[in-house]
């Protein structure tokens, strides 16, 4: 993952997700952390995309919180955070989708779409909330008006 390829907003989301993982004393940076942060964005872009894709953003938010509460916590140690394999796949998928679309940077929309495709537990949360990857991609195109 090369953060230079990410928009400022996407960088901030990644950093906030890492901070969330550390604050909750989780040893791994998982896709659920990123989904939680995206769902809490002030302007509600992720929530709006999930709704536009036919999903239930409130259910996704509740389910991701449940998933995070089930993650093992560690105490002591160096506060080292490890990248979960699913998270690495999410970043790779977001970068590939951005490149394919001709985007200059990886955006939060592409991160959300990648979570729905590659996000492990976050993928399951989004699917249970009714947010399918292809529908999210269509919602992204609609919001961007093809840009």
Give the residues covered by each predicted segment.
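Histone-fold recognition with a strong bias for associated Lys/Arg-rich disordered tails
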Residues: 1-147
